[in-house]
Amino acid sequence: MRKIGIIGGTFDPPHYGHLLIANEVYHALNLEEVWFLPNQIPPHKQGRNITSVESRLQMLELATEEEEHFSICLEELSRKGPSYTYDTMLQLTKKHPDVQFHFIIGGDMVEYLPKWYNIEALLDLVTFVGVARPGYTLHTPYPITTVEIPEFAVSSSLLRERYKEKKTCKYLLPEKVQVYIERNGLYES
């Protein structure tokens, strides 16, 4: 069985925290690779103004292009409507029956697991990997593998706010992503 990590997210924008988590879990669990899974419409963020799929995908490509063990999975972008992890993983396990998927989530999502759509059936499809995030615990009634990572308190919402306030974001996200954001005037208002 191949071991593949999946890190889902809006990636609005992708930052060094995403890359750090993916890389740490890749090494800790001896994964073959990590797939970044950008969502179309995350159920817990419906109604929020999200940057276009095209821009988020371009930024994610720029952020991951130099790591050969990172790739981008477009499964959720090919569907309309909310992106439920269960639906996505059901499709991926059918397409890749030789893969054991490790679904990587932060502490915020570990606490949210009881509210996930079809969580009991999802547990049959993936192994959840929880990584600590400042302000959250990894306590859950569900079985998860935990991976300790260096604390790096950056979030996409923090970066959007910093751009809106015209503050520097240097060293918080890859330079190529920063250039893309500035050239395209993202997050200015």
Swiss-Prot record:
Alphabetical list of CDD domains matching this protein: NMNAT
One GO molecular-function entry: ATP binding
Ribosomal protein in keyword set: no
Catalysed reactions, semicolon-separated: nicotinate beta-D-ribonucleotide + ATP + H(+) = deamido-NAD(+) + diphosphate
GO biological process: NAD biosynthetic process
Keyword annotations: ATP-binding, NAD, Nucleotide-binding, Nucleotidyltransferase, Pyridine nucleotide biosynthesis, Transferase
UniProt-listed Enzyme Commission number(s): 2.7.7.18
Pathway(s): Cofactor biosynthesis; NAD(+) biosynthesis; deamido-NAD(+) from nicotinate D-ribonucleotide: step 1/1
Entry function: Catalyzes the reversible adenylation of nicotinate mononucleotide (NaMN) to nicotinic acid adenine dinucleotide (NaAD).
Family: Belongs to the NadD family.
Record protein name field: Probable nicotinate-nucleotide adenylyltransferase
